[in-house]
């Protein structure tokens, strides 16, 4: 780490009260006492107490002694101190930091500074602890005793362990598609209010399947000290859809599992869920890489994982450790673990790319060695790839795949793309939703699949809640269509683009194209120069084919994890049709106000939608919020006719549903900083009324919905004419009532 290493043992010491185990998201008051070391602290010298980049600890403030986060500092000798709460003014990963400057007088050796985070002496409720769990949450203390602004980390900094709170949200997880007669597992867990799997639940529950599942007990027990329950060796003998309802012993429904489809034993492809993009505390994440993989396997219950640390922080030792861990965790038939890294270049030279290797032991080509300073680690600097074109050149002939994504910095796929290596673009992560990246690829004529991942920094891959900071979305998942669960099969799924993306839910999606005659099918984009590998008249998502036919029959089947709101069918950039499982006659006294979009593509993309609405000539019977992941936000005030809320989006969307007392009488008006508007309620229908708000795909929409929605399945078939020349690129986007979305990878049909 590029801090000064000058005599850390002489820099002083720090202690913290209380220490030990602290509940995530709880309100606390911490007292940190720093005692000056051999040099004291000179006039204009300072301390920094650093916190990791992703943390939502705090925020710290100094002006209101009765408000949350009030923080004070006092010098034992009366020296005057200056306090600042800074973001990105400390070297990563300790990006958030409290600056404590000695601005008058100085500290002698043995003098102390007492810092109270969440000082309750004048009425503050304290400071909120980070909302996600961490084995060692560190108050990282750096000292600049000689006033050089060259900080030295203390040899030991205070730390606490952040643990989950009581469970409040039950989750039941099944696979999405299995073959009849093949064994599978059912997982049950309870998350606390911030999305951490809780080990505090001790309760017996009943399990009821919608169709027979061999080996499923009538009851199971969650035991305190364990993070849920898992039942293995289950089987279903007959094809069809099923789910499991979980109830308490009084019969109250706690949760319903995602849908499971049991298919014929001879079915070629089944479904596996993955999150291949996130990182741990060796780079910019939370908890160790071992903890990271274990969480995805044992607490999120996903099938496929990758680790994507920022390359300019990955030392040779950590690269070896990552490869050792992926080899250890990778167990064919149980869990696929993929080695890789995030090529983390600036957007100007290509932007972020995920690099996934099929095998361990590959060389890493970093975008730079920006935070790697050890001389031994600098030995391979000559292998760096400073822009995306150079990256693709260095990866030629390597057994790997690449995906473009949007994180803090975003990928510019128009700067460079390799048709053989770059097989996907990431449409969604905890950073937000980025359909513009898909459109960038389609505008350039690239033939890529669509994936989604968490890009998580909070140690919760596969179940990544954004917490209370600047992350705006629940993390995404990718469903891989593969014949079996092993690394070779998953890599084939990646290379053939046979996967679909979701914003974190587990639902079933099939897209199939049928042609009247055989088409030439390509494994790789023919832009690579590769020829066809066979012929077929039946194609699925991700397939690329050349055909002489003039039309295709497209079949789409969806089994949602919640009722389906709409399905949008696209040919590349063109919306062909929107299908809803309801019509105008089904609409009830329910209005949805939807807000969506971002400021722009870069890091400061967050749009604040804090606002209010008023119903005129009607009354609000009930209201709820969609896609509100931050408990600090949400509906804040509600009367019979008014409602105020706090919300943000980062390219994704949120919504407020109103159930009205008097049908379609009256009107509704709303006001937010980006846009305001009004409409007659009777004038609203299934098609949204849109109020544009500038920025990046930013708008508010008003629409009416059925009072109650129950239809979780949607099946349709369409005959679609193919473009006379070039590509027809068919894919769908599905939106559920609860706000989750899905995207299929396109089917590419080429006519010369």
Where are these regions (language model features)?
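Domain-core and long-helix interface of multi-subunit machines
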Residues: 316-324, 341-343, 348-350, 354-469, ...
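Aromatic/hydrophobic beta-strand junction motif of beta-rich domains
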Residues: 32-38, 117, 186-190, 553-560
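Ser/Thr/Pro/Gly-rich, low-complexity intrinsically disordered stalk/linker tracts of secreted
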Residues: 1-169
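Short, solvent-exposed loop/turn segments enriched in Ser/Thr/Gly
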Residues: 26-30, 43-45, 180-187, 239-241
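A metal-dependent hydrolase metal-coordination microenvironment
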Residues: 240, 255, 261-397, 493, ...
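Short S/T/G/P-enriched beta-strand
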Residues: 1-17, 153-194, 198, 258-270
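Short, solvent-exposed loop/linker segments at the N-terminal edge
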Residues: 20-27, 40, 176-182, 541-549
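C-terminal functional module detector
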Residues: 173-177, 193, 210, 216-267, ...
